């Protein structure tokens, strides 16, 4: 049951994943990304994040951008596991978790003077959502679902040993549990840097991003019930606590009467009942995690005539999160313990071309170096060896982007774009607690020059995810075969204002 609670809390730790980008990175920091996607060769205000060397080609002056996004995500896991039939009668169950971030803010600023530009931005660079799981997950429920079979098997063993005359647990084939989990994950990033235009065509950027992680998890597992002996549903913990007391009273009486044979029998019953009662006791957790790390960033931009090329490299961010635990009767989240939480290095390359004075197109490429980032430990299912989850990733994440923008008139632009995301994770990485599914993302929107130096951007962005099927002969560590099918949905709305002083 300790393993049960670890799994259910584990799902929280990774449940509030990013809305666009790699395993732990948000790339949708500006509304211009939402409405065009391929922004890696930008020379507008959003270049502060997407192409920081490109700000050297902005107009002289002070530029400011304020953005707000609303993101809504669902995760759906269809799990098939024979013992699930003990709770509802169906071996296949659909588990759905919802994560939402009603408001994700970001601020961009640039001061440009001749060959120099100084830029900064503040944004939610990772996570950004809260997730609630009211019905648990398959990996969680699988460990509860085997309780009826475990009791029947234990009864047979006690009969074989002569401890019980008959198996009083025969007929136990149903279970239920009350579980609740809620989690949030936020990575706040403050980026500062300087860009210098080396020649009329070439500029370079150097800067850093300070990252602060704030995670929070709370949950409980209560009232595990079973129809013991085929009877009514009863609380398993209370049943075996009472059973243990009765057996201990009988054992003490036989010991006092010097009846050692019956003493040994009832002593064994008391010990087994106490063990089951402990395993099925209620569990609770209330824990926060915090940590910080620094990301060095370098960039280059080459601009000539109608062409622009931008390159950015973000170094791997070494980062640990520390437990700040208020309640934990599981023994799994000790106060003060640190867990690896690195942000993978990122390489981006973008090319833009002005097809016509009113028509522009861009393409981009992202590569996340996921295999080099330290992650929380997990067990290799075959060997049982504990290692960082990065060892279960075959190759880093690759993203391919394209977008186009058209000036409808002097004061309005429309744009659209798409992105293909390909994850390199293997079966051992995937679980209903943490899964990455390759996808296609689409965005469209418009920009409106509502005043001489003021621009309004609006956009809608959504993602179509593939389905990933994982079959295992040891579902949830139970020794019984099972299958999960993973998929997700993602929708983001954005609005922003760009102003030049």
Predicted regions span which residues?
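Residues that define the transmembrane beta-barrel architecture of outer-membrane proteins
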Residues: 46, 100-105, 186-190, 290-296, ...
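Outer-membrane beta-barrel translocator domains and adjoining extracellular loop/strand segments
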Residues: 76-83, 131-137, 216-225, 231, ...
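Outer-membrane beta-barrel "beta-signal"
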Residues: 446-448, 460, 487-501
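Transmembrane beta-barrel strands of outer-membrane/channel proteins
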Residues: 64-72, 120-124, 206-210, 311-315, ...
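Residue-level signature of outer-membrane beta-barrel architecture
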Residues: 56, 110-113, 192, 196, ...
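Repeated loop/turn-to-beta-strand initiation elements of outer-membrane beta-barrel proteins
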Residues: 62, 115-118, 201-204, 306-309, ...
């Amino acid at each position: 049951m300790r393993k049960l609670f670890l799994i259910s809390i584990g799902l929280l730790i990774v449940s509030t994943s990013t809305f666009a980008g790699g395993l732990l990175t948000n790339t949708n920091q500006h509304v211009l990304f939402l409405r065009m996607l391929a922004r890696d060769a930008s020379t507008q205000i959003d270049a502060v994040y997407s192409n920081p060397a490109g700000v050297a080609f902005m107009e002289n002056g002070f530029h400011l951008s304020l953005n707000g996004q609303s993101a809504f995500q669902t995760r759906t896991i269809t799990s098939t596991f024979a013992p699930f039939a003990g709770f509802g009668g169906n071996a296949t169950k659909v588990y759905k978790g919802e994560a939402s971030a009603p408001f994700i803010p970001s601020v961009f600023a640039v001061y440009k003077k001749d060959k120099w530009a100084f830029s900064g931005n503040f944004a939610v660079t990772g996570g950004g959502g809260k997730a609630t799981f009211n019905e648990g997950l398959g990996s969680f429920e699988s460990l509860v679902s085997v309780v009826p079979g475990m009791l029947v098997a234990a009864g047979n063993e006690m009969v074989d040993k002569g401890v019980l005359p008959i198996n009083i647990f025969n007929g136990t084939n149903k279970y239920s549990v009350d579980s609740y989990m809620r989690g949030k994950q936020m990575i706040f990033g403050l980026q500062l840097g300087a860009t210098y235009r080396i020649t009329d065509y070439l500029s370079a950027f150097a800067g850093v991003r300070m990252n602060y992680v704030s995670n929070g998890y709370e949950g409980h597992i209560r009232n595990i019930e079973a129809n013991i002996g085929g009877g009514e549903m009863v609380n398993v913990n209370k049943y075996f606590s009472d059973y243990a007391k009765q057996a201990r009273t009988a054992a003490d009486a036989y010991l006092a009467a010097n009846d050692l044979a019956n003493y040994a029998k009832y002593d064994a019953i008391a010990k087994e009942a106490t063990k089951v009662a402990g395993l099925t006791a209620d569990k609770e957790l209330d824990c926060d995690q915090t940590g910080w790390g620094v990301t060095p960033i370098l960039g280059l931009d080459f601009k000539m005539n109608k062409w622009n090329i931008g390159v950015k490299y973000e170094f791997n961010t070494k980062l640990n999160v520390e437990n700040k635990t208020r309640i934990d009767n599981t023994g799994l989240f000790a106060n003060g313990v640190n867990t690896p939480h690195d942000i993978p290095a990122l390489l981006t390359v973008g090319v833009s071309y002005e097809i016509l004075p009113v028509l522009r197109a861009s393409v981009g490429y992202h590569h996340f170096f996921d295999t080099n980032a330290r992650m929380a430990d997990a067990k290799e299912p075959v060997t049982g060896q504990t290692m960082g989850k990065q060892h279960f990733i075959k190759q880093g994440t690759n993203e391919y982007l394209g977008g186009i923008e058209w000036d409808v008139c002097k004061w309005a632009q429309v744009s659209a774009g798409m992105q293909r995301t390909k994850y390199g994770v293997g079966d051992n990485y995937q679980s209903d607690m943490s899964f990455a599914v390759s996808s296609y993302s689409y965005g469209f929107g418009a920009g409106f020059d509502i005043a001489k130096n003021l621009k309004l951007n609006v956009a809608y962005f959504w993602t179509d995810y593939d389905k990933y099927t994982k079959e295992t002969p040891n579902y949830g560590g139970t020794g019984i075969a099972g299958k999960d099918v993973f998929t997700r949905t993602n929708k983001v709305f954005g609005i922003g204002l760009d102003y030049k002083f």
